[in-house]
């Protein structure tokens, strides 16, 4: 009887340990299969690949559960109804694991749109200058993408501003919460388990001369409450958020300089918005660059990859918040971003680095260098189905937006550029901000930000400068090219000179009443100043599209 009692105690203790094990916070990879749908299509089965799918996991489509079958911890399928794709728009897809632990995954966008042969972006006024960082998400639960922007005031203090999305590419006036520290980086996640998206900032304490992080808890109505700072390296800032130890609580990763060497520091989440330092993975890099996260070797543990100036460093995870020594891979220039996604459809995570180098995953934690594409002027990238053809594309952002359309086999077409942003991007966020089924971009640089809505008509260039011309003389003409990049014919209502000094410019065009799919036309503009000094105007193109009108800025100087 005594032996039986001891055995019972052992079994009870073992059960208590195993039964109390939390489900991980899941991570969804791109692409979804299929990656997009035409409006009005029939219902279909959506396959989702990722990490940490527990028994009982459910796929949410715009926040509503769909019938889900978990195939393995890295794959599941869900039934998508015809009513889900009846109309143009972009669905937010997440996977939710049940308690204990668990919770919602990252959001992956599913465009519902007609496929197009090309993609272009039109710059629109932004929302906030002095931004140190920004993130997009549905922070108030109304189903519309919002922006949270972190400001940096002279590296001393800052603020967190909530911009409620209006669903048409514009945003309401901000609700601002103060920060005692400046904001250098910003990421989102539910850090206290209340179902609302919070934010965590990476910062530098000007008094203590240490890098720190601060969580801001979201009340669901646009206000954020600052928690106690944590961290304390020599330099660096927040570069990743994920459940790296599989306990169902989001963790935070920092990268930069610590104690005289490059390092990735892992802070495990406690589930209440606080964090505890777990480990430090040393590397050669001293800079705080973006980080890619995924299970690269298929062992059910999250791994990370960090960019450097001329290499990427792959750290395989041990599943407890620690990592094995890194393995480097050469690339130049590596750029300012890295994304993990399956770009060739073989079920293995690949890496898209900077602007643009592709490393194809072998499924065992190693990578084969793919093709390095010619730099397009933007080191910040995003991956998604930007033209609705079911294949992953890559978009890079700098002074313009460059689109590399994917071929589905790990290769990409030569980039096309559009946008002509007045500020070179140091950061960018992506999402369908006007709910037209097309993924857009908001970029930040100096001195402000701009919104790039994916457009019906591609326009290049975005501005014309004529220099100095004598009064009464006419400059040589310059040409604007207009291209229909949509999947349907586009009627053009008007092309007109507007702005301060339209009488100082001359415009002729070949566009007629509209453009068929893929067609182009030209607008010729010349400068004929009537008075001395700086003269400005715009060419305004009005057409049938949510992004209409588009404008091209004109400038010249009369002598």
Predicted regions and their residues:
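Beta-strand/beta-sandwich contexts
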Residues: 20-61, 66, 100-115, 465-468, ...
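Feature for long, exposed domains in two main contexts
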Residues: 66, 99, 118, 455-559
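Blade-edge motifs of beta-propeller repeat domains
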Residues: 113-129, 164-181, 217-234, 268-286, ...
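Beta-propeller blade termini
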Residues: 132-139, 184-193, 237-244, 289-296, ...
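Glycine-aliphatic tripeptides that mark coil-to-beta-strand junctions in extracellular
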Residues: 143-145, 195-197, 248-250, 300-302, ...
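Hydrophobic beta-strand segments that make up the repeating blades of beta-propeller
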Residues: 147-151, 199-203, 252-256, 304-307, ...
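Short glycine/acidic-enriched loop and turn motifs that connect beta-strands
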Residues: 152-156, 204-209, 257-261, 311, ...
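Blade-level signature of beta-propeller repeat domains, shared across WD40, Kelch, NHL, RCC1
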Residues: 426-457
């Amino acid at each position: 009887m005594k032996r039986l009692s001891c055995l019972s105690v052992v079994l009870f203790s073992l059960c208590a340990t195993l039964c109390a094990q939390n489900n991980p916070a899941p991570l969804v990879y791109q692409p979804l299969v299929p990656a997009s749908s035409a409006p009005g299509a029939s219902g279909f089965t959506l396959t989702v690949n990722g990490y940490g799918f527990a028994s009982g996991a459910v796929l949410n489509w715009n926040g509503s559960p769909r019938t889900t079958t978990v195939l393995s911890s890295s794959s599941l399928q869900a039934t998508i109804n015809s009513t889900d794709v009846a109309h143009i728009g972009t669905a937010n897809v997440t996977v939710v694991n049940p308690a204990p632990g668990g919770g919602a995954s990252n959001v992956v966008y599913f465009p519902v749109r007609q496929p197009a042969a090309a993609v272009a972006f039109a710059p629109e006024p932004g929302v906030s200058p002095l931004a140190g960082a920004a993130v997009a998400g549905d922070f108030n639960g109304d189903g519309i993408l919002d922006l949270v922007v972190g400001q940096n005031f002279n590296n001393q203090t800052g603020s967190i501003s909530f911009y409620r999305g209006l669903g048409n590419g514009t945003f309401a006036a901000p609700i601002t919460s103060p920060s005692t520290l400046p904001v250098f980086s910003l990421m989102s996640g539910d850090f206290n388990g209340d179902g609302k998206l919070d934010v965590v900032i990476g910062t530098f304490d000007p008094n203590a001369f240490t890098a720190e992080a601060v969580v801001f808890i979201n009340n669901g109505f646009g206000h954020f409450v600052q928690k106690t700072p944590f961290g304390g390296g020599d330099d660096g800032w927040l570069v990743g958020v994920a459940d790296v130890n599989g306990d169902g609580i989001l963790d935070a990763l920092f990268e930069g300089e610590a104690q005289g060497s490059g390092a990735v520091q892992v802070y495990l989440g406690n589930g209440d918005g606080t964090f505890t330092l777990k480990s430090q993975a040393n590397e050669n890099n001293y800079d705080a660059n973006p980080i890619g996260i995924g299970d690269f070797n298929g062992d059910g543990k999250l791994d990370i990859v960090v960019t450097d100036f001329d290499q990427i460093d792959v750290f395989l995870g041990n599943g407890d918040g620690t990592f094995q020594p890194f393995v480097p891979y050469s690339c130049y220039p590596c750029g300012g971003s890295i994304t993990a996604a399956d770009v060739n459809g073989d079920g293995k995570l690949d890496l898209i680095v900077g602007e643009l180098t592709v490393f194809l995953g072998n499924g065992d934690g190693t990578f084969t260098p793919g093709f390095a594409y010619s730099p397009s002027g933007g080191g910040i990238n995003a991956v998604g189905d930007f033209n609705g053809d079911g294949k992953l594309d890559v978009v890079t952002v700098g002074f313009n937006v460059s689109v590399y359309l994917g071929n589905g086999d790990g290769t990409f077409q030569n980039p096309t550029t559009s946008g002509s942003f007045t500020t070179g991007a140091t950061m960018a966020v992506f999402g369908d901000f006007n709910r037209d089924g097309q993924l857009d971009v908001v970029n930040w640089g100096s001195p402000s930000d701009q919104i790039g809505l994916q457009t019906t008509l591609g326009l290049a260039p975005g501005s014309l400068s004529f220099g100095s011309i004598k009064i009464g003389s006419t400059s040589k003409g310059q040409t604007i090219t207009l291209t229909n990049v949509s999947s349907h014919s586009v009627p053009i209502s008007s092309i007109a000179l507007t702005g301060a000094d339209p009488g100082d410019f001359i415009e002729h065009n070949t566009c007629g009443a509209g453009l068929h799919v893929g067609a182009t036309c030209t607008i010729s503009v010349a400068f004929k100043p009537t008075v001395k000094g700086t003269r400005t105007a715009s060419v305004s193109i009005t057409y049938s599209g949510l992004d209409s009108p588009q404008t091209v800025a004109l400038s010249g100087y009369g002598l």
